[in-house]
Amino acid sequence: MRQDQRSYNELRPIKITRNFIKYAEGSCLIEMGNTKVIITATIDDKVPPFKKGSGEGWITAEYSMLPRATQQRNVRDINKLRLSGRSHEIQRLIGRALRAGINFKALGERVIILDCDVIQADGGTRTASITGGFIAMFDACKKLYDDKVIENFPITDFVAAVSVGICDGVEMLDLCFEEDSKASVDMNLVMNDKGEFIEIQGTAEGGAFTQEQFEKLLELGKQGIQKIIEIQREVLGEDSKLIGSVPKDEKTSGCDQE
């Protein structure tokens, strides 16, 4: 039994509040245990230079934390006059993950910018940002579709993420901060609703892990993500039927330009 009385294969309580911010084209508040992230989606008609004239869109993300999202105050990136390496790595991950679930041609020549702001951190902020970012991205796409700006709904797959790790020799799902800080192995998994992997990030902290342990972590993460996608589906309700209306084989894959 873990410190919060969960079993090793149990997710923290998840709550997603859709349309959390009034002015954004898409938004949500995602809560995974004590981790809370606000994500907004903004539609911008200016595409990156490598997409100009292509007829294709793009998804990008920014990530930051409130100074007191953690137990000790963190200095804002803007006060350091540069983006921290951690924030840069995380926002690239969020963008890559969500681009895997969209048809750029169907989106048209525009960008959806996802701003992920952590208001309380207790582990898994990047995976929560991806899972909640999908909902915000969905609602931005739905606005374009409902307003008849685009002809076809561009999201091809559900996308969600979760952390897994090994603590005290035990493989665990959805680590809180205390577990993450003492884990001998720490991994982040991103998958779609077809059971396909989008990204696997894994690190052994000062040791090594076996293939058997790796496969156990993958299976734990897969089961967790399936449950998270069911929560996403429930949050979207009937709207979720729009997903996959563009055939997957028409999807244009994107490179990681950011």
Swiss-Prot record:
Pfam families membership: RNase_PH, RNase_PH_C
GO molecular function, one term: tRNA nucleotidyltransferase activity
EC number: 2.7.7.56
Cross-referenced InterPro entries: ExoRNase_PH_dom1, ExoRNase_PH_dom2, ExoRNase_PH_dom2_sf, PNPase/RNase_PH_dom_sf, Ribosomal_Su5_D2-typ_SF, RNase_PH, RNase_PH_bac-type, RNase_PH_CS
GO BP annotations listed: rRNA catabolic process; rRNA processing; tRNA processing
Purpose: Phosphorolytic 3'-5' exoribonuclease that plays an important role in tRNA 3'-end maturation. Removes nucleotide residues following the 3'-CCA terminus of tRNAs; can also add nucleotides to the ends of RNA molecules by using nucleoside diphosphates as substrates, but this may not be physiologically important. Probably plays a role in initiation of 16S rRNA degradation (leading to ribosome degradation) during starvation.
Full protein name: Ribonuclease PH
Keywords, alphabetical: Nucleotidyltransferase, RNA-binding, rRNA processing, Transferase, tRNA processing, tRNA-binding
Gene field: rph
Assembly mode: Homohexameric ring arranged as a trimer of dimers.
Binding residues for phosphate: R86, G124, T125, R126
CDD domains: RNase_PH_bact (cd11362)
Enzymatic reactions: tRNA(n+1) + phosphate = tRNA(n) + a ribonucleoside 5'-diphosphate
Family: Belongs to the RNase PH family.
NCBIfam families in the record: RNasePH (TIGR01966)
Origin organism lineage: Bacteria, Bacillati, Bacillota, Bacillota incertae sedis, Caldicellulosiruptorales
